[in-house]
Amino acid sequence: MLQHQIVQSPARLGLTGPGSPSVQNPTPTRHGHPTSSSSSQSQHQQIQQQPNLLPSSTVAAASSASASAAVSSSALLSLLPPLPRAQALLQQMAVLTSKLFDVSPNRAIWLSAFRGSLPSFLSSHSLPPPPPLENPSPSSTKEILSQFNSLQTQLFEAVTELQEILDLQDAKQKVAREIKSKDSSLLAFANKLKDAERVLDMLVDDYSDYRKPKRSKIEEDDEDNDNESSSSSTTVSSQLKLKDILAYAHKISYTTFAPPEFGAGQAPLRGALPPAPQDEQMRASQLYTFADLDIGLPKTVENMEKKVEALIEPPPPPEAMDISAIHNLLPPNIAVPSGWKPGMPVELPRDLPLPPPGWKPGDPVVLPPLESIAAPRAEDHQHMRPSQGLHRPPDVIQVRAVQLDILEDDDSSDYSSDDASSDDED
């Protein structure tokens, strides 16, 4: 189970092994542990040789491995960095494994299997003594296995943190390589810029004799000679601007139009329209009906102000006509119902003759012969005459008096007309 969790090798994780250069063989004592002097010496040598095994970012964590020797309780073990914590956990697990042989009921079998001596774990490592266990004297294998599982879980967490640190170091190295490549590309670009600058300097030096001479300014002596001096010192290209030419061309094309067959010297155009649609034509188009359609675009105040009101006011509603005046104009078999107004549907009598087969709206209507229609009498003509209220009498046009003033001013022209005099008065 432990082999599946620990992916990296102990050397990469910073854990010292038997073949590492930092291994020191301490002087064993009667109890099998190194003395205090040898322990401090081995710790000092391990801290000095640790930078050769670990990256620069883990040197500080490796230097704190000596702090694990001062841990007096297993509760403080979680406060250590990942590397010293993993080392302390491995030492505790080694102690538990050694005690497992002592507590096992098959101790004699293990001794015979290992040829009279039980194996020792991490005995040759120059590591400080491990912190005390939660249960320093377990009495059964079950207690040892429960403590071993707890230590194994903590070891997995420490290894996970170490793996994250290694991933961050790999990412840091990758970023460093990218920065180095970018620096090399920037350096190459700077070299190209320097070469281009050198070439441009050479070109400027070569063509320094071919500079354009400055134009001499013409002083203006009098206001009368201003136009002549400006026309002699400037050209057409300096007088005209492209923006003005385009604006004038747009103005001509918008307001001037002639049919293709029009020739010079012909009569003036009548009814010709400019090529661009005018305002009234745009308002009569189908697109103008969708001007106020909400299509999801925000409506600004400027768009509301740009709305043009209708140039032609709608005609007033027609005045109510006197229906009694047209009663005598209708045939006797057609009766006008009460409340009927012009524009409402008309119900024709049933006795009207049907149109011939194949007749369509717009075809001529065959009327009955004139002999069958009785001519109305003169009294009927007078009675059928519409009332005078239906026709509006023509308005009286009043022309203002025109004063010609022929003899008052001698400087006036010899010829005058009514139109000219009326224009002057206006």
Curated annotation (Swiss-Prot):
Transcription in keyword set: yes
GO molecular function, one term: transcription coregulator activity
Nucleus is among the record's keywords: yes
Subcellular location: Nucleus
Low complexity: bias regions: 36-56
Record key words, sorted: Coiled coil, Nucleus, Transcription, Transcription regulation
Coiled coil (UniProt feature): 160-212
Residue segments, region Disordered: 1-56, 214-236, 373-426
Compositionally biased spans, kind Acidic residues: 406-426
One GO process term, biological-process aspect: regulation of transcription by RNA polymerase II
Any matching Pfam family: Med4
Highest taxon of source: Eukaryota
PANTHER family documented for this protein: MEDIATOR OF RNA POLYMERASE II TRANSCRIPTION SUBUNIT 4 (PTHR13208:SF2)
Function as written in the Swiss-Prot or TrEMBL entry: Component of the Mediator complex, a coactivator involved in the regulated transcription of nearly all RNA polymerase II-dependent genes. Mediator functions as a bridge to convey information from gene-specific regulatory proteins to the basal RNA polymerase II transcription machinery. The Mediator complex, having a compact conformation in its free form, is recruited to promoters by direct interactions with regulatory proteins and serves for the assembly of a functional preinitiation complex with RNA polymerase II and the general transcription factors.
Family label: Belongs to the Mediator complex subunit 4 family.
Subunit structure: Component of the Mediator complex.
Name listed for the protein in its UniProt record: Mediator of RNA polymerase II transcription subunit 4
Source organism: Arabidopsis thaliana
Upper taxonomic lineage: Eukaryota, Viridiplantae, Streptophyta, Embryophyta, Tracheophyta
Primary gene name: MED4
